[in-house]
UniProtKB/Swiss-Prot annotation:
<dbReference type="InterPro" id="IPR006135">
    <property type="entry name" value="T3SS_substrate_exporter"/>
</dbReference>
<keyword id="KW-0843">Virulence</keyword>
<keyword id="KW-1003">Cell membrane</keyword>
<comment type="similarity">
    <text>Belongs to the type III secretion exporter family.</text>
</comment>
<protein>
    <recommendedName>
        <fullName>Secretion apparatus protein BsaZ</fullName>
    </recommendedName>
</protein>
<keyword id="KW-0472">Membrane</keyword>
<feature type="transmembrane region" description="Helical">
    <location>
        <begin position="28"/>
        <end position="48"/>
    </location>
</feature>
<feature type="transmembrane region" description="Helical">
    <location>
        <begin position="137"/>
        <end position="157"/>
    </location>
</feature>
<feature type="compositionally biased region" description="Low complexity">
    <location>
        <begin position="370"/>
        <end position="404"/>
    </location>
</feature>
<keyword id="KW-1133">Transmembrane helix</keyword>
<feature type="region of interest" description="Disordered">
    <location>
        <begin position="341"/>
        <end position="411"/>
    </location>
</feature>
<dbReference type="GO" id="GO:0009306">
    <property type="term" value="P:protein secretion"/>
</dbReference>
<dbReference type="InterPro" id="IPR029025">
    <property type="entry name" value="T3SS_substrate_exporter_C"/>
</dbReference>
<dbReference type="Pfam" id="PF01312">
    <property type="entry name" value="Bac_export_2"/>
</dbReference>
<comment type="function">
    <text>Part of the bsa type III secretion system, is involved in the intracellular replication of invading bacteria inside the host cell. Probably necessary for the lysis of the vacuole membrane and escape into the host cell cytoplasm.</text>
</comment>
<feature type="transmembrane region" description="Helical">
    <location>
        <begin position="80"/>
        <end position="100"/>
    </location>
</feature>
<dbReference type="GO" id="GO:0005886">
    <property type="term" value="C:plasma membrane"/>
</dbReference>
Length: 411
């Protein structure tokens, strides 16, 4: 069996929470409940009501009806105890829900016969958690002994003074001293509670650790699911309005960087010879633009420097390309025209002579592209750009088909 060394993933934690396996610091919940009860007891528990009931019964001097007598005591008990019990229940339920992240563990409610397995019971008996609980119990005994000693040193005069207290105040004084003892015990036990929570958190994550195969399998199930991929494609498509889709389809090419920026360039020499920014998107919308352009056959040029420059210098859509970027855009347009002409088998369009810094084309035809991306990297490609596959190294495509319109472009 492979060693479990990987931290549990978010999906693993969610699945475990549905089964009831969540991080539970039970002692911290108990601390909150006891502290809430101790602080609320002086205000909610009024023992003078009990004394008053005894006085009322004794003053009548008659034999009380047993039914009415029991009903009166039950009603008095509910009046005293109900607010106190409800407050303590709420104080215990809220931290438990926070620890479980408000997850309803439906599967843990089902009847499970495997819980009666004696082998599993023996494993739990000799587990790290059992050893932790044994050490914790010993620490609590020491904490209680320390609490009693400190309480006796601080409040021994008040305890012995109860013998001289008035009967009307005796119940209240007992409640006050009990609350002080409980709060002092909780204060002394606080380091043990924090240590117990830390060890419990460590054991919880240790039980849910995964091996590398489980992590890979979970990733494959979540990322490789066809329904999930289809849903993601739908989300990308929904990111684009019909207007932006039309602008992408009418663009001469899309320059990308390569996943965070997508700039559409449109040129119509009959109207104005300056290139025009038809699309300007970032992040998830940029990915959607690239996907739509590839689906429509619009060339996608992956040029980091040019995409960033146009995005920086052309701050709005439907604006002209800055004069600093016109040279780079025109190089891409000329190069795309040469590749399309080579694919058609005709002469390349009239272009200026390349400078010494530009690579020369080999026989006017680009070399074959990558089989995965259907791209080509011709020798006369402008810096930072690439083109669709233009054919074989010996010449244009034999079928004389239409030029390729999509592909990855790399600097």
């Amino acid at each position: 069996m492979a060693e479990k060394t990987e931290k549990p993933t978010a999906k693993k934690l969610r699945d475990a929470a549905k089964k009831g396996q969540t991080f539970k610091a039970r002692d911290i919940v108990a601390l909150i409940v006891i502290a809430t009860g101790a602080l609320a007891a002086p205000a909610l528990v009024d023992l003078t009501r009990i004394a008053a009931e005894f006085v009322r019964i004794a003053s009548t001097g008659a034999q009380p009806n047993p039914g009415a007598y029991a009903f009166a005591w039950a009603k008095l008990f509910l009046r005293i105890a109900a607010p106190f019990v409800l407050l303590c229940a709420a104080a215990g339920a809220l931290p438990s829900l926070v620890q479980s992240r408000f997850t309803l563990a439906v599967e843990s409610i089902r009847f499970d016969l495997t819980a009666l397995d004696p082998v599993k019971g023996m494993k739990r008996l000799f587990s790290w958690r059992s050893a932790k609980d044994a050490v914790k119990a010993l620490l609590y005994v020491g904490v209680f002994a320390l609490t009693v000693r400190v309480f006796a040193g601080l409040y021994h005069a008040d305890v012995f003074g109860l013998f001289r207290a008035r009967p009307a105040l005796l119940g209240h004084m007992w409640i006050v001293l009990t609350v002080r003892l409980v709060l002092l015990f909780l204060l002394c036990a606080l380091p043990v509670l924090i240590l117990d929570a830390a060890v419990e958190y460590f054991l919880y994550h240790r039980e849910l650790k995964m091996d590398k195969h489980e992590v890979k399998q979970e990733y494959k199930e979540s990322e490789g699911n066809h329904e999930i991929k289809s849903k993601r494609r739908e989300i990308h498509q929904e990111l684009l309005s019909e207007e932006i889709k039309a602008n992408v389809e009418q663009s001469d090419f899309i320059v990308a960087n390569p996943t965070h920026i997508a700039i559409g360039v449109y040129v119509n020499p009959d109207i104005v010879p300056i290139p025009f920014v038809s699309v300007r998107e970032t992040n998830a919308r940029a990915l959607a633009v690239i996907r739509h352009a590839e689906a429509c056959g619009v060339p996608v040029v992956r040029n980091v420097a040019l995409a960033r420059s146009i995005y920086r210098n052309s701050p709005r859509r439907y604006s002209f390309v800055s004069h600093d970027d016109i040279d780079g855009v025109m190089r891409v347009l000329i190069w795309l025209g040469e590749v399309e002409a080579a694919n058609r088998g005709g002469p390349p369009p009239e272009t200026r002579a390349p400078t010494s810094a530009e690579p020369q084309a080999r026989d006017g035809v680009a070399p074959p592209g990558d089989a995965c991306a259907d791209n080509a990297f011709p020798d006369d490609a402008p810096p930072g750009a690439a083109a669709p596959n233009a054919g074989s190294p010996d010449g244009p495509a034999p079928d004389g088909g239409a030029p390729a319109r999509t592909g990855d472009q790399n600097a």
